């Protein structure tokens, strides 16, 4: 099993690489790539951790050596949010980075499962899909926008509010991965109920949690460590599914039947070929139904922006 992390020298990439080095199955290969010259050194640093995970680092313009033979590619490359920016401000820089890296994936390991972390995810996943399509290698069951951070934040905030153990809570989060497109389905948590005010406040906090971190870091960065953990959780779920484990379910932003939007975050059953089944989002409360309808314009525009970027 080979996992490649692109953007491995950044805040998310280093945290993700550390978690994968300690948690990937024995005998796995982990390859780190970043344009930054420090990347081979990050790999050497991590190589001293005593786990049976082989690690190599690559830097420079060409990601090909890192991608050769990869089963899973996780992309965190790009610029991070600063105070006053929203995820869409990142578009101008990150769109080009994602296009370039996905073109290299299409040439080098076209059958790999691809997880996109680089924001704005609503748009960068659409860019990746169009690049793969142009190259003639697009499989919608193998491309994922990693929205796991919304899930782990929801789990944490609900557990805090209700005095529960966070590991006992699993909140499905649907829609997209920015602002109003993030919709935690709080009505679907077994044995936990909320007042209308709690639902409104929690939903808003989950939607704005990224900004909470950006402001708390006072210009020194964005959510890198929690995002690293979220990406590791999702990446390790992909590994377990590829190895044949059954009933591996994660919420992820994928191309589906287009009922709400071309790309939509929903619970996904993972399997040996990526998406095994897009699970139904289930029954929504009136609040959730309204929030879903209200987000769709934004989501459609985000997706269209990515499609146009590649096809203009």
Swiss-Prot record:
The active site is at residue 177. One of its GO terms (molecular function) is L-malate dehydrogenase (NAD+) activity. NAD(+) binds at residues 7-13, 34, 94, 117-119, 227. GO terms for cellular component: cytoplasm. Pfam families: Ldh_1_C, Ldh_1_N. Substrate binds at residues 81, 87, 119, 153. The keyword NAD applies. InterPro entries: L-lactate/malate_DH, Lactate/malate_DH_C, Lactate/malate_DH_N, Lactate_DH/Glyco_Ohase_4_C, Malate_DH_AS, Malate_DH_type1, Malate_DH_type1_bac, NAD(P)-bd_dom_sf. Keywords: NAD, Oxidoreductase, Tricarboxylic acid cycle. One of its GO terms (biological process) is tricarboxylic acid cycle. It is an enzyme of class 1 (oxidoreductase). This is Malate dehydrogenase. It comes from Yersinia pestis. The lineage of its organism: Bacteria, Pseudomonadati, Pseudomonadota, Gammaproteobacteria, Enterobacterales.
